[in-house]
């Protein structure tokens, strides 16, 4: 299994629609504005966060249960920024839609810009032949409100290609998050 380079990522996005929309260079700033970088890097792709957020609030229940999750535990926000309360979390989605090849596993890591502010990004691996918008989870580990910026970089995807295809892909087994669009809540 090997990590894939910017050349491979660019080719797969342009010829096979692996990432849409696709930014073929790393964007660090536009005109005089500062942005958190996004687009292709040497061995990865920095994804952007869309402007749709679900911010967790504990007004309806005392227990968070992944088997019986209360959608009312979130406040929906559409904005260029999202303020996450102290010691809380928010869900969002990537701007980009992914189509992962059958012989590739994709790992997501948070960006240091956010990590150094106490904001942790969590995403499970994107499995072979999974496709959809990636639901992002942001944890604010600080005792102060934390800000997330829409349409800027929030995490980096690393593409690992196996030397052989898997026997059963995410698509083959009818994965419950296949083809997800928008911010997707837990499913069982």
Swiss-Prot record:
It catalyses: dCTP + H2O + H(+) = dUTP + NH4(+). Pfam families: DCD. This is dCTP deaminase. It is an enzyme of class 3 (hydrolase). The active site is at residue 137. Homotrimer. Pathway: Pyrimidine metabolism; dUMP biosynthesis; dUMP from dCTP (dUTP route): step 1/2. GO terms for molecular function: dCTP deaminase activity; nucleotide binding. The keyword Transcription does not apply. InterPro entries: dCTP_deaminase, dUTPase-like_sf, dUTPase_trimeric. It comes from Pseudomonas putida (strain GB-1).
């Amino acid at each position: 299994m090997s990590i894939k380079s910017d050349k491979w990522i660019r080719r797969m996005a342009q010829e096979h629609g692996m990432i849409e929309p696709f930014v073929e260079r790393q964007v660090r700033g536009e005109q005089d504005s500062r942005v958190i970088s996004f687009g292709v890097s040497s061995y990865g792709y920095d994804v952007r966060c869309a402007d749709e957020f679900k911010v967790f609030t504990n007004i309806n229940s005392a227990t968070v249960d992944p088997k019986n999750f209360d959608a009312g535990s979130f406040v929906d926000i559409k904005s260029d920024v999202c303020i996450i309360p102290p010691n809380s979390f928010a869900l969002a989605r990537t701007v980009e839609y992914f189509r992962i090849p059958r012989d590739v596993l994709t790992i997501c890591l948070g960006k240091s810009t956010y990590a150094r502010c106490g904001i942790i990004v969590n995403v499970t691996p994107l499995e072979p032949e999974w496709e959809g918008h990636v639901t992002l989870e942001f944890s604010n580990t600080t005792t102060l409100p934390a800000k997330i910026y829409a349409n800027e970089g929030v995490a980096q995807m690393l593409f690992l290609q196996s030397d052989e295809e898997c026997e059963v892909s995410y698509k083959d087994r009818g994965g419950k998050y296949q083809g997800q669009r928008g911010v997707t809540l837990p499913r069982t």
